[in-house]
Amino acid sequence: MKMDVMSFIMNIINVMINTIIDYLNVNRVLALLMAFLMAGGIASMINKNFIIKYFGSNTPKYISYTVAAVSGSLLAVCSCTILPLFASIYKRGAGIGPATTFLFSGPAINVLAIFYSAALLGWDIGFLRAVFAVVVSILIGLSMEIIFKSHEKKRALRVPKADKISDRPLYQTITFFALQFIMLLVITASPKLFPTLSMPLYDGFLLKHLLFIILGIILAVTTKIWFKDEEIKNWLRESFTLLKIVFPLLIIGVAIAGAIKAIIPPSYIATYVGGNSITANFIASFIGALMYFATLTEVPIIKALMELGMGVGPAMALLLAGPSLSIPTVLTISKVLGKTKALTYLGLVVIFSTICGYIAGIILR
């Protein structure tokens, strides 16, 4: 009996270690690096008033939520990679509503994932995923703003309008962030959707890695020419500060997610998420909210679960909750927003994903 328990524990530990190793592959480490550098750039280079102008709680909702949803959807990133960017804009004065809309929309309204879902699961599922993801991102943001309205009033800053994104020429700031943004897109590009970028050049060295290096050199040269040494130091300091806060929590969360996968196998999950009951959709949403899905990996996993008997509704619930949330996300959000707001965000993601999954199950049955 003791041997069985020890074997079980050792298996879980082994899975956790392997999950961390798989997580820390070259492409993901580079993607996280770019996310932290972009976040550090937002914190140090962007005029604080400019962020408040478009993301602040006093900004008209049709502007702040549209900007938040669109900004997030342009990033083909997972729930972990979006965290440093979310932490940065919230720290700089973004309202909790637009900030959490941005947090959800990054992984959930991922344009690449939407098309990949359509290609692998069917265009009806892909289309509904896109519609529900936009709606849910805004509903979550509005709900967070309403629930924590009193706290946001205390936090809101009355600042003059900011017409400039920064004190330097606009083209320099745009180039600085555009290069990092393109580097992030290049390194996270799916080989299924962009096979050319994954063309091997030498022993695991791909075309995307060469392009990443070239863009990195251009970024380094332009930054050195345009920015003062003190500005560069502040940028790197802010990036490293975020790295120290977020990265350990990501690793802990990924390990826990790996343990959950070891304890609850997909075939076992599938038996409880067949059909289209509220319970089945809730279970799918809740499990999706705890498990970690790297960018685009949720699609083949859900396809496999559907082949094992998962209903269309629970599959949609998992498509919405899975990529947008995970244990690493919850742990990190609690550090940025506090435990109450983090758990509220978790609850809202699960609730809205459950409802949308149930509706999808009715529409697509």
Curated annotation (Swiss-Prot):
It is found in: Cell membrane. The chain crosses the membrane at residues 6-26, 32-52, 67-87, 108-128, 130-150, 174-194, 201-221, 245-265, 282-302, 308-328, 344-364. One of its GO terms (cellular component) is plasma membrane. Signal peptide: none annotated. It comes from Methanocaldococcus jannaschii (strain ATCC 43067 / DSM 2661 / JAL-1 / JCM 10045 / NBRC 100440). Keywords: Cell membrane, Membrane, Transmembrane, Transmembrane helix. It is a multi-pass membrane protein. PANTHER family: UPF0718 PROTEIN YRAQ (PTHR43299:SF1). This is UPF0718 protein MJ0584. It holds the Pfam family ArsP_1. InterPro entries: DUF318. Its main location: membrane. The keyword Nucleotide-binding does not apply. The keyword Cell membrane applies. Belongs to the UPF0718 family.
